[in-house]
């Protein structure tokens, strides 16, 4: 789907729980100030104060799902020293307590969320997106944390 600001509810940023230390970073509540994205027309739409959720994928070591929420703190910019399409977007990330995280199973159980792009195209590059309807459904699950 072509994303436009007219039907963007929030961004969905992804981390691979099997190939990264994201579980350890979440356990320590590490402050994360930037996230890697791949330059596209979508990154050109990214701007400060837009909401996002962090989706952690994985099968072996982590429970996949939404682990954090936050807002973008600026536009996506070229990652210094990187070549190609790699960019970084500044973020203000807030880790969710483990009991509040929304697992992939819980997302699939909610008919309002079953069509998330991250479920339909799990290998797609960062960023993914949520519609306003998806955001309303997620807020039902994550309130008052988000």
Task: Name what the model sees in each region.
Residues 58-64:
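Short basic/aromatic-enriched segments
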Residues 54-55:
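A generic structural signal for residues embedded in beta-strands
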